[in-house]
């Protein structure tokens, strides 16, 4: 029973992103070859995140890992491991973009509906199916973002769309902080400073890219 309880979050995470990728494949008007390329890139990045979460879990519990490695592997990952995984994965993604292995704008345009649908499915599964975990506030926020995305994604320039979604998500999360004790993303409690940092870094990257294109 304990083993099943530990496998449930992994299964829900995998099922949610599988649903997000399937939704992207069905609804995208890209060619099959481009869809395949984007899906391979997204799966690679998601695998990186999962691997780095496990590495982060080991690093944040290094003393216990030295004493009893199996105990750490059975121990649930915490927010620090999640932060570390996002940081390292972001750096690797940035390097791949700089080296020309990934085209940033098309990749993000493909990844946004995947992450939104995956987030929606994750919260839905916990709230409706498992009836444990998940928060109605974040579920509503993701639902609104998903609706907003599909209303305006063909009407706005890509980078303006990225900024709008980032602003709405960040503002929505801070509103949730004011009415509930914590906010979770894929089961990990995220602190306000992480939201600010995530928002700031992404806004700077988007605006710098716009400025460079404008100068060129």
Give the predicted meaning of each segment.
Residues 1-216:
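Hydrophobic, membrane-interfacing alpha helices
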């Amino acid at each position: 029973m304990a083993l099943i309880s530990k496998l449930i979050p992994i299964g829900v995470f995998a099922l949610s992103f599988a649903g997000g990728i399937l939704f992207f494949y069905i609804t995208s008007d890209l060619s099959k070859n481009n869809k395949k390329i984007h899906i391979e890139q997204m799966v690679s990045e998601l695998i990186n995140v999962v691997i780095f979460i496990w590495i982060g879990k080991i690093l944040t519990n290094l003393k216990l890992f030295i004493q009893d490695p199996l105990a750490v592997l059975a121990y649930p990952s915490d927010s620090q491991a999640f932060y570390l995984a996002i940081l390292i994965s972001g750096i690797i993604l940035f390097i791949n973009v700089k080296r020309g292995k990934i085209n940033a704008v098309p990749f993000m345009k493909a990844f946004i509906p995947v992450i939104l649908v995956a987030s929606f499915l994750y919260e839905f599964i916990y709230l409706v199916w498992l009836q444990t975990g998940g928060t109605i506030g974040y579920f509503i926020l993701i639902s609104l973002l998903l609706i907003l995305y599909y209303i305006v994604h063909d009407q706005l320039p890509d980078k303006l769309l990225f900024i709008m979604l980032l602003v709405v998500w960040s503002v929505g999360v801070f509103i949730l902080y004011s009415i509930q004790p914590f906010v979770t993303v894929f089961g990990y409690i995220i602190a306000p400073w992480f939201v600010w940092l995530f928002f700031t870094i992404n806004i700077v990257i988007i605006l710098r890219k716009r400025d460079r294109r404008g100068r060129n």
